[in-house]
Design a protein with these regions (language model features):
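Helical subdomain adjoining the active site within ATP-dependent kinase catalytic cores
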Residues: 4, 19-25, 29, 33, ...
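ATP-binding glycine-rich loop module of kinase domains
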Residues: 19-79, 101-102
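Conserved structural core of kinase catalytic domains
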Residues: 71-114
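Conserved alphaE helix
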Residues: 110-124
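Catalytic-loop of the protein kinase fold
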Residues: 122-143
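Conserved end of the kinase activation segment
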Residues: 176-187
Length: 258
């Protein structure tokens, strides 16, 4: 966990031996991403050369370091400079992204345990006045002990800093209701988390899930009955809604009963 007063390391871009790194086959608009061959560290080299944008990232990074007291976010601990700030280094988390959770686990009880841990971690992040904003299953890393870690943290909104990043799940949802938010707030994060949950469970967007299909799935996964009211609320035409965290709807202590 990061404490107040902890300073980030800093290295020169020219000191990085890229022959010892492997470039990840990951389509990112923001960065070229590498991992060392021992899979200990993630290197991100920003694609932008806009000095104002880079300066903004550096301010946000400093705030994230100070905020991450509960350790639920993977915040870079080293900055890379090449005359100016141009990248970061952070620890690599062995495991899988949440979008691969059904490949790793077939047992719905195990899957639900992971989802509930991720939901509780999201609440912890919100309590530190951070909004994930680009919340999606590729940005939640599940380690080998089934604990969740929120990654790609420079896309988050910290306190009152402006942030233009919006999750594709939330963007689709807001567009369907003709909503143009001024900023992404934690209540939207909670909606996005449930959108993500239903998306992974049904392998389609919420807008494509029919009520009859949902009710049929309830026979297979019992906890969906508890989520039916939230599902209806999300699918409703109401613009301003507030949904609970997943772990507030489903008792984490009863994860063997899903």
């Amino acid at each position: 966990m990061v404490k107040e007063g902890v300073y980030m390391d800093r290295i020169s871009y020219n000191d990085i031996d890229f022959n010892k790194l492997m470039k990840l086959d990951y389509d990112s608009l923001e960065s070229n991403i590498y991992v060392d061959k021992e899979k200990q560290r993630i290197y991100k080299i920003f694609k932008t050369e806009d000095l104002c944008e880079l300066s903004y990232k550096l301010v946000k990074l400093d705030l994230l370091q100070r905020k991450n007291k509960k350790g639920k976010m993977i915040v870079p601990d080293t900055t890379i400079f090449d005359r100016h700030f141009c990248g970061t280094i952070e620890k690599y988390v062995p495991g899988v992204n949440l979008d691969d959770i059904f490949i790793k686990y077939r047992d719905i009880n195990h899957v639900m345990k992971v989802f509930l841990d991720a939901s509780k971690s999201l609440q912890d992040i919100h309590e530190e006045k951070v909004v994930v904003a680009d919340l999606n299953s590729a940005n939640i890393r599940i380690d080998e002990n089934d604990k969740s870690h929120y990654i790609d943290t420079l896309s988050y909104r910290v306190e009152n800093l402006d942030n233009n990043t919006v999750s594709y799940l939330l963007k689709e949802y807001l567009n369907s209701k003709n909503i143009q938010p001024k900023k992404i707030i934690k209540e939207m994060d909670k909606i996005t988390f449930l959108l993500m949950y239903f998306n992974l469970l049904f392998n389609k967007s919420v807008n494509e899930i029919s009520y009859s299909e949902y009710e049929k799935k309830e026979d297979e996964i019992k906890c969906l009955k508890n989520l039916y009211d939230s599902f209806k609320l999300i699918k409703s035409r109401r613009k301003n809604i507030d949904v609970p965290y997943l772990h507030e709807i489903i008792d984490p202590l009863n994860y063997k009963k899903y």
